[in-house]
């Protein structure tokens, strides 16, 4: 680990992935990428190279995914409210790490974010920024950093919009980076083949 952030990583892994497999038989986060890596494991690994403590939030019944994330080095939080959406899952991760110096929130279906991007977000957050957001060619991506002053607002999140309202109503430090991985997620089998 070249840089060790003071923040806690929150890896959101509680979605249903219905576009990847409408029948719900295969969890996209457990799918193998063309290089053989597992989607969620790779996303966790990249976060853990910068953030020493990562909480992965999964939904109940995702024991195989929890095992993979534990093996990657994450602590796992089961969110009983995961069906209510990303906001509820994020709130569960924040609640489980309320004493943190800040949070770097990443999505488990985004395995190609450059480690340098995670480090840039972490350094900016650790340097005192309130909210840090990476951009690539004008588009907002992940991971997003939140300072400790947002604890209460993050704990109250619910629904499927995640923390978008916080981004819209608070000062955001924008990082323009050359990393298309901040926008690339695995929503379909075609996305996976393109990784």
Task: Label every PLM stretch briefly.
Residues 34, 77-81, 175-177:
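Short beta->alpha connector loops at strand-helix junctions that form conserved
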Residues 81-148, 152-155:
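Conserved beta-loop-beta/alpha segment of the NTase-like Rossmann-fold superfamily
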Residues 42, 64, 88-92, 120, ...:
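Alpha-helical elements of Rossmann-like donor-binding domains used by nucleotide-donor carbohydrate transfer enzymes
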């Amino acid at each position: 680990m070249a840089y060790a952030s003071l923040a806690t990583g929150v890896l959101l892994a509680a979605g249903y992935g219905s576009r990847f497999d409408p029948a719900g038989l295969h969890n996209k986060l457990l799918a193998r990428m063309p290089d053989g890596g597992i989607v969620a494991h790779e996303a966790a690994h990249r976060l853990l190279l910068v953030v020493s403590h990562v909480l992965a939030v999964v939904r109940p019944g995702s024991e195989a995914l929890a095992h993979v994330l534990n093996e990657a080095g994450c602590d796992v939080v089961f969110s009983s409210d995961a069906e209510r959406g990303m906001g509820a899952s994020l709130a569960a991760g924040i609640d489980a790490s309320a004493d943190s110096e800040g949070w770097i929130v990443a999505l488990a279906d985004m395995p190609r974010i450059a480690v340098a991007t995670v480090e840039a977000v972490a350094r900016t957050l650790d340097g005192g920024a309130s909210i840090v957001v990476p951009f690539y060619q004008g588009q907002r991506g992940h991971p997003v950093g939140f300072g400790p002053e947002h604890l209460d607002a993050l704990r109250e999140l619910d629904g499927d919009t995640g923390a978008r309202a916080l981004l819209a109503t608070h000062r955001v430090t924008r990082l323009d980076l050359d990393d298309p991985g901040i926008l690339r997620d695995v929503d379909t089998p075609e996305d996976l083949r393109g990784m």
